[in-house]
Regions:
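Alpha-helical linker/edge segments of TPR/alpha-solenoid repeat scaffolds
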Residues: 104-113, 141-147, 174-183, 247-255, ...
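Conserved structural position within tetratricopeptide repeats
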Residues: 83-86, 116-120, 151-154, 190-194, ...
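TPR alpha-solenoid repeat register
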Residues: 94, 128, 161-162, 168, ...
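Alpha-helical segment of the N-proximal tetratricopeptide repeat
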Residues: 54-90, 97-100, 104, 171-178
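Long, contiguous interaction/recruitment modules in multidomain scaffold/adaptor proteins
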Residues: 2-60, 126, 138, 142, ...
Length: 389
């Protein structure tokens, strides 16, 4: 075989080898790619299994913590929420519940650290703002407490948004009453009352708070709304009676208090208040539609009662009275002979003059000798009722 033939054979063999390699290379690449895909999928699957297991463990610890938190087992709850956070360090719900458990243990500084971090992440979260408000209130940081309470009122709530907002406002009102901020409490109560709906129990609670805020007009209105659907509610009847009493509407108060005592005979406060109201109604000579003779007898009795009050007043009161040019005692003694039924019939203006003196005696005596009782109390209330007339 000559040299050219050998070269030809070698070239053919080389070409055949190259063709074999070229045909096998895609197969090799495809195989390697398939292996890579399988490995990637496998690693991804293992990763998902790993994360799913961690999530499951975290949720399991969290569920235990939630149950212990409900049962006020705060120490166990803290441990369980911390265990849950090991599996999901930034979980919002885990951190929030841990903060609540820490609050239960009075560890407010630790709770605050979690809560302020959560607030920075979600400043519109209602529960976070509420817990921050409570902590600020405990620290007597009034401005901060009010800010967080108002944030919570207008914040987002996951469930029953309107109910939660109403509950926060109620808590804010009780806080304001606790710090003697009556005017602010009244404003919040008026805002709350506008959105109560037909829930009579809520109307009654708001009425009670209006009483505490000394807003008797709104209190009476809320008690009336309560009684529309529950007219035998003894607590609402007593509250309405008290509100009407404070407003000086004694005949109205009498009706409510009579009903309150009938509904609850053990209500001694309403019974005592009713006695005072009855005395006011019976002792007021200025009330309408009473016969002249009866009016005159009431004036005579009131004048005698005021005289007895003067006599029984304390020595300190008497000494102060003697310092004035003309004491109430002297005025009473000088007027006494005129206070007869005959004189009162002949001189109608005498009734007003005598009652002005009676009222002056009762006011001064209450200042010098302490709060009055019985008919003296009734006369003092009547004096306030007709003050300026």
């Amino acid at each position: 075989m000559d040299e050219s033939s050998e070269d030809t054979i070698a070239a053919a063999e080389k070409e055949a080898g190259l063709r074999f390699y070229l045909t096998r290379e895609p197969m090799i690449l495809a195989l390697l790619s398939a292996i890579a895909v399988v490995l990637f999928v496998g690693v991804g699957g293992l990763s998902r299994v790993y994360h799913a297991q961690r999530e499951s463990l975290g949720n399991r610890w969290f569920a235990r913590g939630v149950e212990d938190l409900k049962q006020q087992r705060y120490e166990q709850a803290v441990g369980e929420f911390r265990a849950a956070l090991r599996y999901s360090r930034d979980n919002y719900a885990y951190q929030l519940n841990l903060a609540q458990a820490l609050i239960g243990l009075k560890r407010t500084s630790e709770a605050y650290a979690y809560l302020i971090n959560l607030w920075e992440r979600e400043p519109e979260n209602g529960l976070v703002n509420l817990e921050l408000a409570r902590i600020a209130a405990q620290k007597k940081e009034t401005e901060q407490a009010l800010r967080y309470y108002h944030n919570a009122i207008y914040a987002a709530w996951s469930d029953n948004q309107e109910v939660e907002r109403g509950n926060v406002r109620l808590e804010l009102i009780e806080y304001l009453l606790g710090i003697k901020s009556q005017a602010q409490a009244q404003s919040e109560l008026i805002a709350l009352a506008a959105s109560l709906g037909d829930d009579s129990s809520l109307h009654q609670r708001v009425a009670d708070l209006f009483l505490q805020a000394q807003d008797y007009e709104h209190a009476l209105a809320e008690y009336r709304l309560t009684l529309k659907s529950d007219h035998r509610n003894s607590a609402a009847l007593a509250g309405a009676g008290l509100a009407a009493f404070e407003l000086g509407r004694y005949p109205l108060a009498q009706g409510y208090l009579e009903a309150a005592v009938a509904a609850n005979p053990k209500d001694s406060q309403s019974r005592d208040r009713l006695k005072t109201v009855e005395l006011v109604v019976q002792t007021d000579p200025f009330r309408r539609q009473i016969p002249v003779d009866q009016r005159n007898r009431i004036v005579i009795q009131a004048f005698e009662t005021a005289g007895e009050r003067l006599k029984s007043c304390s020595a300190a009161g008497d000494s102060r009275e003697r310092a004035s040019p003309q004491t109430l005692t002297e005025m009473w003694t000088k007027m006494k002979p005129q206070i007869t039924e005959r004189s009162l019939r002949k001189n109608p203006d005498l009734m007003e003059a005598s009652m002005d003196l009676v009222f002056a005696i009762e006011r001064k005596s209450s200042t010098l000798c302490g709060p009055p009782t019985g008919t003296d109390m009734a006369l003092l209330l009547i004096s306030k009722l007709h003050e300026g007339n």
